[in-house]
Amino acid sequence: VQSTDETDDYNFGTWEGNPLDMFAAAITGVNVEDAVLCGEGTIDGQAHKGDWWQNHRVRRGAWRGRLLFLNHCKNITVQGVSFCNSPSWNLHPYFSDDLRFLDISVTAPADSPNTDGFDPESCTNILLAGMHFSTGDDCIAIKAGKLYMGATYKTPTSNMEVSHCLMENGHGG
């Protein structure tokens, strides 16, 4: 299953702010409500074992996937899980509301390209608490949509609280 064009609101990811063909995230939620992902496990994208980080701006069939992508989701809690070695952004909620990310570790090598830690895009009511970020790009990058989605919906991310988070490698929050 793939997005058919740049106007598909219910897609498996966005690239440069447009809903384009992408590899699905390791964990993908579309229209999910009242869900919890909790545990002490690790979601390892193993991007370092392939060529995901080489020529990272070149599309290979589809754009590089995320580790977690939430599209139009509501009342979601992610707690205690570790995310590492994503091919691209790690945690990417998109047009979602009432999100809590608690006591999570997000890591990637310091030289890994575009491995942002947390990229909320056009989301509302977000809490990040007790997070540890050490990535090859932005630890946190707050987005309002870009190109087609930004021009169409004009929806900035709003009401976001960040507390007790450690940001190491990467560009901070």
Give the role of each language-model region.
Residues 1-173:
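Extracellular/periplasmic carbohydrate-active domains that bind, remodel
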